[in-house]
């Protein structure tokens, strides 16, 4: 099994979600199944089937989270430094077409959320940035087309 790089914050979020699913969602779903069973005929019991589907989805996510946690390689970004972009870096970019500034942190796949400025290490943006430094220009090919960015800042913050 391949290790999955992840920040301390990302690992904590996975553990919190797993705990919630095991200690809150699982008992809630079991209760919903019991209540639906008490209604009688299970063949046409929509509440029962909905609760069983919720149970299946929850247990699937629990297994996925347990796998991610067991394969996690936790990286303390606050202990990293350097002038080149690598995992954990927070990178400030200028879009060379629009002059718009963007900031992304390069994180592990399980914690990526583009809307929050966290891009996966395997994303086109991160792959283009890895190994580059301030002042470098990178070309990024995305589903929306090609973009050109200048790197104007690199920092490592936990």
UniProtKB/Swiss-Prot annotation:
Asked if Transcription regulation is a keyword of the record, the answer is: yes
Q: Which GO terms describe its biological process?
A: DNA-templated transcription elongation; regulation of DNA-templated transcription elongation
Kindly state which keywords UniProt assigns to this record, in alphabetical order. DNA-binding, Transcription, Transcription regulation
| Family matches, as InterPro entries | GreA/GreB_C_sf, TF_GreA/GreB_CS, Tscrpt_elong_fac_GreA, Tscrpt_elong_fac_GreA/B, Tscrpt_elong_fac_GreA/B_C, Tscrpt_elong_fac_GreA/B_fam, Tscrpt_elong_fac_GreA/B_N, Tscrpt_elong_fac_GreA/B_N_sf
What does the record give under GO molecular function? DNA binding; RNA polymerase binding
What's the superkingdom here?
Answer: Bacteria
Regarding protein family, the annotation reads: Belongs to the GreA/GreB family.
Function, as annotated, reads: Necessary for efficient RNA polymerase transcription elongation past template-encoded arresting sites. The arresting sites in DNA have the property of trapping a certain fraction of elongating RNA polymerases that pass through, resulting in locked ternary complexes. Cleavage of the nascent transcript by cleavage factors such as GreA or GreB allows the resumption of elongation from the new 3'terminus. GreA releases sequences of 2 to 3 nucleotides.
Q: What is this protein called?
A: Transcription elongation factor GreA
Annotated organism of origin: Methylobacterium sp. (strain 4-46)
